[in-house]
Amino acid sequence: MTTSPVRWGILGAANFAKTTMGPAIHAAHGAELAAVASSSAEKVAGFAAFASGVRHHHSYEELLRDPEIDAVYIPLPNHLHVAWGIKALEAGKPVLIEKPVGMDFAEIDRLIAARDAAGLLAAEAYMIVHHPQWQRAKALLADGTIGKLVHVNGAFSFFNDDAGNIRNQAASGGGGLRDIGVYVMGGARFVTGQEPLKLDYARVQWEHGVDTFADMGFAFEGFTYQAYTSIRSAPRQEMHFHGEKGLMTLTCPFNAGKFDQAELHLSMPDQTVRIERFPVVNQYVQQVEAFGRAIRAGETYAWPLEQARGTQVMMDQVLAAG
């Protein structure tokens, strides 16, 4: 087993990479932020402010050819994820791709084929599965704490009507579902371990080719599911798992530590509520470390591309129906 740090390269100098994932790579045990590829030296200098040894590659291709890069993180606009993910794999680099991995499930299928051909790890940067709040929710449902599951519902919203923001640009894969729908859909699938049987309904509001609000319902084996996403509403994020014996509520389930404190509330039939509070954990650091253990020690990664594909199938159905 190789014990040397995983040397990471980032394709692009996206603001999220500079403020969140870059610092997470730098802080993670067994990881090193080695290089950033960008045409802008000024943007790369923003990474050097916290990772002094980071090198500047002037093109994505140059970074992928770098023999001193062990893994690649891709925070590019959504419509570029799969193409550059495949190029990274073909260059012999394991790759962590920002969510959503693809524009549709057929794109993810191409990426899965490239992953299998390369024999390397490729995964979606889906950080919530590395947070103890979500891991605890999955365990509590599995051990029967709330009894047989009958319904799941979720909500994720924030307000952003800036036409210049990538979330509001159709050509690059903008819209609320791709940005935050992955969480209310994928989170339900992660905790329950199930895939939906069918789409029951979808109502989608559109502005300039991007979905700004979506309300959706799915039927699963033994339980129903409802959620909404909005990028034109005041901030809200919650997940609820309704069982025959109790209700499990996850507060601040998607931006723990930023939006609010991560808690898990268990409401039981005797009218008691048990609250579990989770310490502040950087789920992005946890994600980087888990990816490193997967490629260095062969540990199973919690969110493989097949999981991303399952969420994308749900998203594709809502977008098509709406």
Where are these regions (language model features)?
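Hydrophobic residues in well-ordered beta-strands that form the structural core
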Residues: 17, 58, 97-98, 122-124, ...
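Rossmann-fold dehydrogenase core element
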Residues: 109-127, 148-150
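Active-site loop of classical SDR/Rossmann-like NAD(P)-dependent oxidoreductases
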Residues: 16, 258, 276-289
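Contiguous beta-strand/loop segments that form the cofactor/metal-binding neighborhood of enzyme cores
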Residues: 185-257, 288-299
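N-terminal Rossmann-like dinucleotide-binding module
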Residues: 1-51
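C-terminal helix-rich "cap/oligomerization" subdomain common to oxidoreductases
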Residues: 1-5, 71-73, 290-322
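Beta-loop-alpha module in the N-terminal Rossmann-like domain of NAD(P)-dependent dehydrogenases
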Residues: 54-114
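Predominantly a Rossmann-like dinucleotide-binding segment in NAD(P)-dependent oxidoreductases
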Residues: 128-200, 207
